[in-house]
Amino acid sequence: MMASMGRRRRRLAAPGAKALELIAAERREHPTRAERALAAILNEVNGGALEGRFRREWVCGGRWIVDFYFPEVRLAIEVDGGYHRSTFQLGWDLFKAAELESAGLTLLRLTNQEVLGDRARLHGKLRHAWWTALESGRRSRSAPGQ
């Protein structure tokens, strides 16, 4: 058992998009409490405050995994637990955000507390991010030379 776990970890840690797909699949099978809660909330408000299908643990450009993604409006949502408060992870998250936004995605970062806390406030943040992404997509499609 331990030997197979070691091989599995090495395989998942291998560079490349295939490794990211494996990691994303594992994360879909074992979401955090906040990710489970947000998935339920997104299903609840989908078609109302938010429209369109979303994907969980989506691999973006073969380089990044985002917790939730609405492809129709290019909205990525990340749920950040305590680990994201470390100095290293804060820097990495800023780098990831810059790359995602430069690729034309709108990124909404939520803490576990925001997801598990005040539901009305969360709905407002989700609606605002969704409309921001929708408007951003409209602007980029109507830009000269596009």
PLM regions: where:
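Short, contiguous strand/loop micro-motifs
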Residues: 25-26, 82-84
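A short beta-strand motif that forms part of the nucleic acid-binding face
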Residues: 80-83, 114
